[in-house]
């Protein structure tokens, strides 16, 4: 295998590992502070830590003082405001859900967006969905049922919040996909993280969260991890990894491994356990995630069909 490809795959897998462990950090942080306090501090740190990354990349590319890059920055700022508002909804519902559900389970339910993106893309933007998308949806639905639905057709409120998070994340990805080729990726993250942090502040008071220096300092490990490693390092590894990735499908699969790492770290660190029914749901959702990202083979031409015949 090409050394560049090997390094690319390693970077993406490491990013997935960092993101998977972030579910554990988020869950632990809820023992000390409220969801909006956590979101405000984490995203402020995430935005701040990406500023030097952006400046270094701009300087290396010679765009830091380039007049032609101004329009891109302006447009990126506008898209960042929209993405930030959507991301606020996604991260807040996820954080609330993590108060009531296991980190590993939350990781897999959140990953449902991978299956939902092509479906909503077809509904909103009229993008054609392949046969494997619909099979993935069916498999994921059965997996979600086994993972979340209990006897008497009841569902934990934590799971409801995380399912809402997956749906909102779907819209976030669709917006990024729509405007991604016209924006600066790192600047977009800086803006959207800053927006999430700002929007979280009033909800700290609306939700009547007790904010104190001692509480925040108790959660400092979780905040630093999610702010610096998950946002700063994880995002940078994604940029490096995708730059030299030869196969987009493999890149997507490696990044989606965050849900698997969420279960592993939840088991190792938080001692979370899945029932046989929930584990079956995890297997089915994993299969749906993998299937949804596999490339569809090119259609054979009439000449090729005749040659085979």
List where the protein language model places each region.
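Hydrophobic/small/kink-forming positions within alpha-helical transmembrane segments
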Residues: 20, 24, 84, 88, ...
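Glycine-/small-residue-enriched transmembrane alpha-helix faces in small-molecule transporters
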Residues: 1-41, 85, 93, 153-178, ...
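C-terminal-most transmembrane helix of multi-pass membrane proteins
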Residues: 43, 51, 59, 219, ...
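Specific transmembrane alpha-helical segments of multi-pass solute transporters/efflux pumps
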Residues: 22-23, 55-110, 146, 227-245
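C-terminal transmembrane-helix exit sites in multi-pass transporters
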Residues: 49, 53-54, 113-135, 260-279
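Hydrophobic transmembrane alpha-helices of multi-pass small-molecule transport proteins
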Residues: 50, 129-149, 167-169, 200, ...
